[in-house]
């Protein structure tokens, strides 16, 4: 009965204050009102600030009224004061836990100011780094740019030299091919002239041979005509001779 009666004072109806217990040491949303949860990290120089000292913190319930209420419910004054002292200790421990795990708005603003100061320090370090390291990098880049320009100029000169050599080789090869073509054309012209000369000689020989053949054929025709006349004469003489002999025999036979 006493335990139930004690926990009744921890309910929301007591003194109009929302003091709610939650298991495993977790805080209820009513206690988190007005606070912002945060995680504490030591990545920067944080200056811890205590806004409300322990002796100036106010309790969340009226201790005197609670002692009187306990006395009216059968507790003597010493027991009531002991219970209230225990409750005060629990309240202070809970508040310490709350102040350790959460921060107030003022603490948040101070932390933000510290973070901004830390960011300013980082920004200054970045400026210094830019003036030192980036200057070295810029100088190195300029040096590399100069070297690249030199290499580029060397490549241009080498390319120009190779192009000039190739142009000279091409001109020499073109001259050689032109001379070779001229020699071939000259040889072809000589061969053509020789062939024309041989052709004319051949045509002349053929013409002479043809004339000789025509002359021989004409003489043969003349000889054949003369032989034909001689043959006709001989045949005619033979026929007349035979007729004469036949008439002689006929006359001789007729006379006999």
From Swiss-Prot:
Any one GO cellular component localisation term in the record: mitochondrial membrane
Transmembrane segments: 231-253
Predominant subcellular localization, coarse grouping: mitochondrion
Annotated keywords: Coiled coil, Membrane, Mitochondrion, Transit peptide, Transmembrane, Transmembrane helix
Top-level taxon in the UniProt lineage: Eukaryota
Entry's localization field: Mitochondrion membrane
Transit peptide per record: 1-42
Subunit relationships: Interacts with MCU.
Protein name: Coiled-coil domain-containing protein 90B, mitochondrial
Gene: Ccdc90b
């Amino acid at each position: 009965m006493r335990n139930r009666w004690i926990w009744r004072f921890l309910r929301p109806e007591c003194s109009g204050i929302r003091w709610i217990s939650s298991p495993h040491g977790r805080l209820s949303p009513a206690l988190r009102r007005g606070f912002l949860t945060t995680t504490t990290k030591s990545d920067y120089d944080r200056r811890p600030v205590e806004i409300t000292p322990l002796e100036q913190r106010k309790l969340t319930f009226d201790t005197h009224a609670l002692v009187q209420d306990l006395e009216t419910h059968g507790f003597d004054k010493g027991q009531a004061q002991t219970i209230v002292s225990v409750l005060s200790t629990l309240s202070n421990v809970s508040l310490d836990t709350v102040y350790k795990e959460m921060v107030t708005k003022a603490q948040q603003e101070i932390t933000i100011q510290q973070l901004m100061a830390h960011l300013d320090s980082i920004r200054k370090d970045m400026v210094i780094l830019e003036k030192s390291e980036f200057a070295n990098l810029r100088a190195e880049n300029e040096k590399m740019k100069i070297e690249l320009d030199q290499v580029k100029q060397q490549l241009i000169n080498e390319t120009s030299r190779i192009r000039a050599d190739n142009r000279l080789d091409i001109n020499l090869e073109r001259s050689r091919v032109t001379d070779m073509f001229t020699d071939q054309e000259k040889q072809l012209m000589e061969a053509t002239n020789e062939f024309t000369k041989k052709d004319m000689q051949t045509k002349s020989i053929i013409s002479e041979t043809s004339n000789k053949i025509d002359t021989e054929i004409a003489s043969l025709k003349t000889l054949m005509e003369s032989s034909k006349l001689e043959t006709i004469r001989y045949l005619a003489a033979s026929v007349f001779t035979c007729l004469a002999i036949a008439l002689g025999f006929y006359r001789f036979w007729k006379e006999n």
